[in-house]
Design a protein with these regions (language model features):
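Beta-propeller folds
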Residues: 21-274
Length: 274
């Protein structure tokens, strides 16, 4: 390919020559007869549709081998054609990144006995959550995303929610480490740094503490990635003992739970995507 790129005669038709040398990825045709409303047609590519696509989101190894192979070929082909733009890609990336203040802090907000705020640094990719007692100058770090990712040793690390209990003792956090948007909830004792509740799986990520801080409320995702159930979890107990407190029967709606600003009421919201 380098020969053709440097040859004056071939330079005009370099893309045609590359297509010959580096075969354009072709998705295999597997004809299948479809019919609907008295109309019949042949679909060559319906085979790539996986009925268990949500399972693939949870575990990428379940992707059809032929589909994976085709996607990898497409990526390789694209990378080759865009290799001459790597410098401009980096330049654009650096320019956009340069407009973001990486070393930054949010304004503090007061919650019960503490002031809370977050900060980011030039060295880290994730935020740090800090707090200090209202009558103290001692700053306490209760969450560091980069350290948490390092402990888990994962490639993907998505943070869903960070919530502190009303008694300021517990930190509830939810993580997606697969990119599936199914979040796992954990409860940590801030003082001892020990995990009290190890895993509540396949949730939306939202965490709401009860006023007595004995429980949390959360929404569970079903196999179709819909949040139709709200559970109550006793902190320190096992997920299998969680109590279902609300279920939306309509598949068109999703549910969530939140606490009113005066902390007197819990709201269960059910709505469609509109």
């Amino acid at each position: 390919i380098n020969y053709y790129e440097n040859n004056k005669y071939c330079k005009k038709n370099i893309h045609i020559l590359i297509d010959i040398i580096m075969k354009i990825p072709q998705l295999e045709k597997k004809p299948e007869i479809k019919s609907c409303h008295n109309t019949t047609w042949e679909d060559n590519y319906s085979w790539i549709h996986q009925t268990d696509i949500l399972e693939v989101l949870k575990d990428s190894s379940k992707l059809l081998p032929d589909v994976r192979k085709y996607l990898e070929e497409e990526n390789a082909y694209t990378d080759y054609h865009l290799k001459n733009t790597k410098d401009i890609q980096k330049k654009l990336f650096d320019e956009i990144k340069g407009r973001i203040k990486l070393d930054d802090e949010s304004l503090p907000y007061r919650d019960h006995s503490y002031d809370y705020w977050t900060k980011t640094t030039t060295k880290g990719n994730y935020s740090i959550k800090l707090r200090k007692k209202i009558d103290s100058n001692e700053i306490e770090e209760i969450w560091n995303g980069d350290k948490e990712k390092e402990k888990l040793n994962v490639e993907y690390f998505g943070v869903g929610d960070l919530e502190v209990s009303n008694n300021d003792r517990y930190l509830g956090f939810s993580l997606d480490i697969k990119g599936s948007e199914y979040y796992t909830i954990y409860i940590r004792d801030i003082k001892t740094n020990k995990i009290i509740t190890k895993e509540i799986t396949e949730t939306t990520g939202g965490i709401t503490f009860s006023l007595d801080d004995k429980y949390i409320f959360y929404s569970k995702l079903d196999e179709n990635h819909r949040a139709r159930k709200i559970f109550r979890h006793e902190i320190g107990n096992f997920e299998k003992k969680d109590e279902l407190i609300f279920e939306e029967k309509s598949e068109a709606f999703s549910v969530s739970i939140s606490l009113s600003s005066d902390e007197k009421y819990y709201f269960i919201n059910t709505s469609d995507h509109n």
